[in-house]
Amino acid sequence: KYLEVLDFNHIDGCCESVSLQSGKEAVENLDTGKDSKKDTSGKGDKPQNSQTGQGSKEQTKIGTVSKDVNVGSKGKEVPRLQKITKKMNLPTVGGKIILSLDHLLEYKPNQVDLFNTRATKTEFESWYSAVKIEYDLNDEQMGVIMNGFMVWCIDNGTSPDVNGVWVMMDGEEQVEYPLKPIVENAKPTLRQIMHHFSDAAEAYIEMRNSESPYMPRYGLLRNLRDRELARYAFDFYEVTSKTPNRAREAIAQMKAAALAGINSRLFGLDGNISTNSENTERHTARDVNQNMHTLLGMGPPQ
């Protein structure tokens, strides 16, 4: 009987083949009726689903999507308050708020970029370009020069009264550079220019302290005893919101000690002044001094 059923002249593709399904949903390619059911049942729902999908995307972009609430849950959703509302006492002109609240909520610039104690980026670039031209160096050489000048300023400060030369070590040899191009082109001040080097100088001091005890000369003059505060012991350190309270107090005390005893005058002595009045005082040998004629017979004290 088996031989009667078998067709030895069978050719591939000439007959239909039947595949039996195992009942597992994992084999979706063999389910011939599944796709037809999807097509008949979901034809009217496709536009609605696409619209709801677009609406959900728009809601996620706006950020106003509320939380899904279960049908069986009870209670109310906790409201969220806005950071800045129009009910605040905001500046207005003609009854209209002049602030852009949406922009204000996103405007979070770097704090140090707004400090007026730091030279602007344009001023710093102008200073760098002027020093580069007067020293007649390229960018690679200027990188080495800036390293040496930063370390020199850590120990010697950034006073506007500095003059002469600054030195940089090349092994055991001292190399001198004139200070005039650096000081004259520093606008507004040299200290405001050097505030751009604050983080690099702090990291350099930490690196030196990790190898051996290192205290900048500014801290030695102020008699700073805590070596943990050595990283703040230079006069162009930029105090920020991240500066610890103890470090801020030490910086203020060192600055007060550095400024103690300094008497600055707005006007100096004018050398272009001559006295036009004539002195007509007459003195004799019996006068006590040039400002006193006589003591009525009394002699000078013995």
Curated annotation (Swiss-Prot):
Q: Where is the composition biased (Basic and acidic residues)?
A: 28-46
Q: Which InterPro entries match?
A: Poty_coat
Instruction: Give any Gene Ontology cellular component.
Output: viral capsid
What are the site positions for Cleavage?
21-22
Which keywords appear in this protein's UniProt record, sorted alphabetically? Capsid protein, Nucleotidyltransferase, RNA-directed RNA polymerase, Transferase, Virion
* Composition-biased stretches (Polar residues): 47-63
Q: Does the keyword Transferase apply?
A: yes
From the record, give the cysteines joined by S-S bonds: none
Q: What is its EC number?
A: 2.7.7.48
Fill in the PTM field for this protein: Genome polyprotein of potyviruses undergoes post-translational proteolytic processing by the main proteinase NIa-pro resulting in the production of at least ten individual proteins. The P1 proteinase and the HC-pro cleave only their respective C-termini autocatalytically. 6K1 is essential for proper proteolytic separation of P3 from CI.
Belongs to which family?
A: Belongs to the potyviridae genome polyprotein family.
Name of the protein in its database record: Genome polyprotein
Protein source organism: Watermelon mosaic virus II (isolate Australia)
